[in-house]
């Protein structure tokens, strides 16, 4: 149930919003000053709020159809399908909150204030942990699942509240502006540039996440537990990816955008080179560590309750396959930044679409022999192809 809103979080919160928004607003700030950049931020925030509200209403109404699309294998079990629909309806409001939070965080990053957005994942984790502690002794799994799903949306609300508070602390003047406001006409060109960048940024930055979604769809047709094995393996793999890849790209984009606006080619190239070196130096040891200790890591994190030794083994196999793509996943996060800083949307999207098609082909070939592990192998191979072409 958390897979769909979590996909939105990773697509928007971990790259796309930064890639589309920062180059545009950096240009406005450089040319016209902070007051005008605040105004443009308010325009985009107001527009996104209305769009997300409409999306939320539509998604809540048509959630059964959405679940059929992302988990077609669940339709064979009516109880599992109904439960997934109910839980997805509770978690989906998180999408509304996290997309607005990501936009506000991108603006704070432009101003060099990274701490506020960096703390938002902690809010999500603490809210979930708090909910689990409350229902620790509750035996009814359905009740626990419902409240746990609801806690995700509550966490999203707290995250948005925190980031708006951070905006005020940074003296950013956020206003809700209607479409009749003259500012919409005055900034028509910049709004168009942002929208032109956003769709390619989602695909360019989110190839890994979209590939994982495809993996999950195919995994729903495999034996019970296959989706969970991939999900838990991805959660472990996300730790170094989040700490390194996302952190580096988040810090690099505002700096690189500024260098591009100032036409400082030497400094721009130096920033890119240092980021690539840093990513490789830390991702390769992480790969080796996860490969050698995958079973021990999964055992330590998950081997309790209904998570059996067999589950541990099958999850560790998926983690081993995914970890081989770790340096590539991190390099992609870094390598797409120069393209978006230069407002080049075509190259990343072409490479990402090619890698997604390759991933799908490999999935269909490997799933028969290696089941869920074959899906993880396909994701890693396609990531390396993506990174090498971008390089």
Model-derived features: positions:
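Membrane-embedded alpha-helical bundles of multi-pass transporters/translocases
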Residues: 1-391
């Amino acid at each position: 149930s958390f897979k769909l809103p979590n996909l939105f979080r990773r697509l928007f919160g971990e790259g796309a919003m930064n890639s589309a928004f920062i180059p545009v607003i950096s240009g406005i700030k450089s040319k016209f000053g902070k007051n005008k950049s605040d105004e443009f931020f308010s325009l985009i925030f107001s527009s996104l709020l209305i769009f997300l509200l409409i999306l939320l209403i539509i998604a809540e109404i048509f959630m059964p159809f959405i679940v059929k699309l992302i988990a077609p294998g669940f339709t064979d079990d009516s109880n599992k399908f109904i439960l997934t629909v109910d839980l997805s309806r509770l978690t989906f409001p998180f999408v509304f909150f996290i997309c607005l939070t990501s936009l506000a965080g991108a603006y704070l990053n432009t101003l060099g204030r990274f701490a506020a957005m960096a703390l938002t994942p902690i809010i999500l984790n603490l809210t979930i942990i708090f909910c689990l502690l409350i229902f620790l002794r509750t035996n009814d799994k359905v009740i626990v699942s419902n409240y746990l799903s609801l806690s995700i949306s509550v966490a999203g609300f707290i995250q948005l509240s925190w980031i708006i508070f951070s905006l005020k602390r940074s003296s950013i003047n956020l206003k809700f502006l209607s479409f009749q406001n003259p500012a919409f006409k005055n900034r028509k060109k910049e709004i168009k540039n942002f929208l032109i960048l956003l769709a390619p940024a989602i695909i360019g930055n989110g190839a890994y996440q979209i590939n994982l979604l495809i993996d999950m769809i195919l995994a729903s047709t495999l034996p019970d537990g296959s989706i969970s094995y991939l999900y838990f393996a991805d959660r472990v793999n996300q730790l170094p990816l989040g700490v390194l890849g996302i952190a580096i790209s988040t810090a690099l984009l505002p700096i690189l955008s500024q260098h591009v606006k100032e036409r400082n080619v030497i400094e721009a190239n130096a920033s890119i080179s240092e980021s690539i070196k840093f990513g490789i130096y830390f991702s390769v040891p992480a790969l080796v560590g996860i490969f050698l200790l995958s079973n021990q890591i999964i055992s330590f994190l998950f081997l309790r309750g209904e998570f059996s030794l067999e589950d541990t083994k099958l999850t560790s196999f998926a983690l081993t396959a995914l970890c081989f793509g770790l340096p590539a996943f991190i390099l992609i996060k870094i390598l797409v930044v120069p393209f978006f800083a230069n407002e080049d949307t075509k190259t990343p999207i072409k490479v990402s679409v090619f890698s997604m098609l390759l991933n799908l082909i490999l999935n269909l070939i490997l799933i028969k022999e290696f089941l869920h592990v074959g899906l993880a192998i396909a994701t890693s191979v396609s990531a390396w192809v993506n990174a090498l072409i971008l390089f």
